[in-house]
Curated annotation (Swiss-Prot):
Pyruvate binds at residues 47, 206. This is 4-hydroxy-tetrahydrodipicolinate synthase. The record marks 46, 109 as: Part of a proton relay during catalysis. The lineage of its organism: Bacteria, Bacillati, Bacillota, Bacilli, Bacillales. Keywords: Amino-acid biosynthesis, Cytoplasm, Diaminopimelate biosynthesis, Lyase, Lysine biosynthesis, Schiff base. The gene is dapA.
């Protein structure tokens, strides 16, 4: 079995203009990603500010992306919530719109135990019958999909991947022991650890920074797959990532997507934009990165 994708999937931002979703800016951004070698597009996830999008907005965004991508790369819809039934409903809608797969975050706030996690994920997957990417991000949910639980879930024919945002290589190694990596993909959820994640056998990354440097980030994966040492190639990307860490995702990345004119620099409360000085420093870091490419 082939993996859902290999290399860089982009955790897509949502462009706003005057607090409304700007679908034209969204189309321009998606075209930019497709032209620059993105291998998958993830819609309505954390980076998209999904908690502050209405159901109607999520559906319009997803339909716009699916229609534009037109099967050139997989479109993965974030449909997971901390309510199993609502997650099923959202997943059915994503399937009806033509999503290639869904991404399911662990329940948050009303967090469960590992047995509950299995039942939650299996209930959604059994109902919808679309490929599923599990999303493990304990820093946001205070809930971890333990390696033993990943092993159980990986045996389901529709559960095909894990987005691993633990930034914990011991966790990665323990998961790897328990799954068949020929049929179950491991994607990093942390842009800054991809060099080691790839070296340890990861199949790719679901990336924030690839919103603005998709070609360069995919080239890193391709070089590693060719057997090259990518430490030096990563260094300028690492410098840009350090600048991007000035605040919580997606606050900084939207300072850059707006710089590329994919919507205004707007976020929905409770998120707020960077201070002007931080925005200037971040955009200068991006300019420095791009200038270095052209030397």
């Amino acid at each position: 079995m082939t993996h859902l994708f290999e290399g860089v999937g982009v955790a897509l931002t949502t462009p706003f203009t005057n607090n409304k979703v700007n679908l034209e800016a969204l189309k321009a951004h998606v075209n930019f990603l497709l032209e620059n070698n993105a291998q998958a597009i993830i819609v309505n996830g954390t980076t998209a500010e999904s908690p502050t999008l209405t159901t109607d907005e999520k559906e319009r965004i997803l339909k716009t992306v699916i229609d534009l991508v037109d099967k050139r790369v997989p479109v993965i819809a974030g449909t997971g919530t901390n309510d199993t039934e609502k997650s099923i409903q959202a997943s059915f809608q994503a399937k009806a719109l033509g999503a290639d797969a869904i991404m399911l975050i662990t329940p948050y706030y009303n967090k469960t135990n590992q047995r509950g996690l299995v039942k939650h994920f299996e209930a959604i997957t059994d109902a919808v019958k679309l490929p599923v990417v599990l999303y493990n991000v304990p820093s946001r949910t205070n809930m971890t999909i333990e390696p033993e639980t990943v092993e159980i879930l990986s045996q389901h024919p529709y559960i095909v991947a894990l987005k691993d945002a633990t930034n914990d290589f011991e966790y990665l190694e323990e998961v790897k022991k328990r799954i068949d990596t020929n049929s179950f993909a491991l994607y990093s959820g942390n842009d800054d650890n991809v060099v080691e994640y790839y070296q340890r056998g990861g199949q790719g990354v679901i990336s924030v920074i690839a919103n603005v440097i998709p070609k360069e980030f995919q080239a890193l994966y391709d070089a590693q797959q060719s057997g090259l040492d990518i430490q030096d190639q990563f260094k300028p990307i690492g410098t840009l990532l350090s600048a991007l860490s000035v605040d919580i995702n997606p606050i900084p990345i939207k300072a850059l997507t707006s710089y590329l004119e994919f919507g205004n620099y707007e976020l929905r409360l409770p998120l707020v934009s960077l201070e002007d000085t931080d925005t200037k420093v971040l955009r200068e870091a991006y300019d420095t990165f791009k200038a270095g490419e052209n030397e």
